[in-house]
Amino acid sequence: MRIHYLLFTFLLVLLSPLAAFSQKINEPVSCIRNGGICQYRCIGLRHKIGTCGSPFKCCK
């Protein structure tokens, strides 16, 4: 029965940092802070990591 407690605490510690990455970027300041740039479309090797407003996307 003790193994269940150890397994639960291990999973809790392992999965808790993932909650921080579930928030979306939806403003230009947070886009720039996360190393992205605001463009109309993501061109080339850049991929969308959020939005900077209605028509613009945050690309990194």
Curated annotation (Swiss-Prot):
GO-annotated biological processes: defense response to bacterium; defense response to Gram-negative bacterium; defense response to Gram-positive bacterium; innate immune response
Disulfide bonding pattern of the chain: 31-58, 38-52, 42-59
Entry GO CC: extracellular region
Keywords: Antibiotic, Antimicrobial, Defensin, Disulfide bond, Secreted, Signal
Cellular compartments annotated: Secreted
Residue ranges the record assigns to the propeptide: 23-25
Tissue specificity remark: Most highly expressed in testis and heart.
UniProt keyword Signal present: yes
Signal peptide segment: 1-22
Family annotation (Gene3D superfamilies): Antimicrobial Peptide, Beta-defensin 2, Chain A
InterPro entries per UniProt: Defensin_beta-like
Function as written in the Swiss-Prot or TrEMBL entry: A synthetic peptide displays antimicrobial activities against S.aureus, P.aeruginosa, E.coli and B.cepacia. The antimicrobial activity against S.aureus, E.coli and B.cepacia is reduced in raised concentration of NaCl, but its action against P.aeruginosa is independent of NaCl concentration.
Family recorded in the similarity comment: Belongs to the beta-defensin family.
Protein name (record): Beta-defensin 8
Species of provenance: Mus musculus
